[in-house]
Regions:
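The conserved beta1-alpha1 loop
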Residues: 13-18, 137, 163-164
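Conserved loop-alpha-helix segment in the C-terminal half of the alpha/beta-hydrolase fold
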Residues: 165-183
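Gly/Ala-rich beta-loop-alpha elbow adjacent to hydrolase catalytic centers
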Residues: 102-112
Length: 274
């Protein structure tokens, strides 16, 4: 697919949260400034399994609802995870190629796993390396055999991590960010939700996205330049600015824990009512 400027759009696979749906995640993301992902083609599939229990968004957003896999109360044992991974690898291969992943909660957790596995040569060996990742309230898997592979080395993918001050997954989300080389962390005052973005957050995310787009175009669809390992983190609060200057966007225009996870994943309803 091509954008309005005739350039080929980069593709992002977007994975929804537990017992919601692709259409619900699309609605959540729709409250963001549309210019942020104007140069991306975004795909919102439904989870592989129908919801195995009550969805907390019942009465807020219409069914059906889905989940990607199941887990125990401590988020240390997983059911149907391998089947889910196989399904997504087939989806990415048959409907791709994709340039990156975006996910909320269970979807973000799963996306990070796919990125780590691909980096280690475990999956998607014939698919071009995924280049970018948008994580909203994601966390690491806790099963040692998974961690030893997926997070063995820092993941060299351009990543941005949204972390809520009131999110019950705040600390696990911070831990996930450390699994990536030079992550951009954007904090917000909300809870476990796809947050509404203030002007500064919009600017930071827009610049992050446009850096990737411009790098992709300048290398004629080659992989995005490797990230600089000498920089450990790009916390947005590291250097306060009086105003946010979206220089790159302007130039382009010119050119927790598992116990709570199952019970509270559906706080995503905040995304509708916020």
């Amino acid at each position: 697919m091509k954008g309005e400027d005739g350039a080929k759009m980069m593709r992002i696979l977007c994975l929804h949260g537990f017992r919601t749906s692709g259409s619900f995640l699309r609605k959540q993301i729709s409250k963001w400034d549309p210019s942020i992902f104007a140069h991306f083609d975004m795909d919102f599939p439904d989870g592989i399994f129908p919801a195995g229990g009550k969805s907390e968004i019942e009465g807020i957003f219409p069914p059906p609802y889905f989940e990607w896999f199941q887990f125990n109360k401590d988020f240390t044992e997983y059911t149907n995870l391998e089947e889910c991974i196989a399904y997504l690898c087939e989806y990415i291969t048959s409907k791709g190629p994709f340039d990156g992943l975006l996910g909320f909660s269970q979807g973000a957790t799963l996306s990070a796993l796919l990125l780590g596995y691909q980096a280690q040569g475990k999956i998607l060996k014939e698919h071009p390396p995924l280049k970018l990742f948008v994580s909203i309230s994601g966390l690491k898997f806790r099963e040692p055999s998974i961690c030893e592979v997926a997070y063995k080395d820092p993941i060299r993918v351009k990543s941005v991590h949204f972390i809520g001050d009131k999110d019950w997954l705040k600390l696990p989300s911070e831990e996930l960010a450390t699994a990536f080389v030079n992550p951009l962390v954007i904090r917000h005052p909300q809870g476990h939700t796809v947050p509404r973005l203030d002007e500064e957050a919009v600017c930071k995310l827009s610049n992050w996205a446009m850096e990737i787009i411009l790098s992709q175009r300048s290398t004629n669809a080659a992989p995005v330049d490797t990230v600089d390992e000498t920089v450990t983190n790009k916390e947005e609060e590291a250097e306060p600015k009086e105003e946010c200057e979206c220089e790159i966007a302007a130039a382009a225009a010119g050119a927790g824990n598992g116990i709570a996870l199952q019970r509270r994943e559906a706080e995503a309803v905040e995304a509708v009512n916020a």
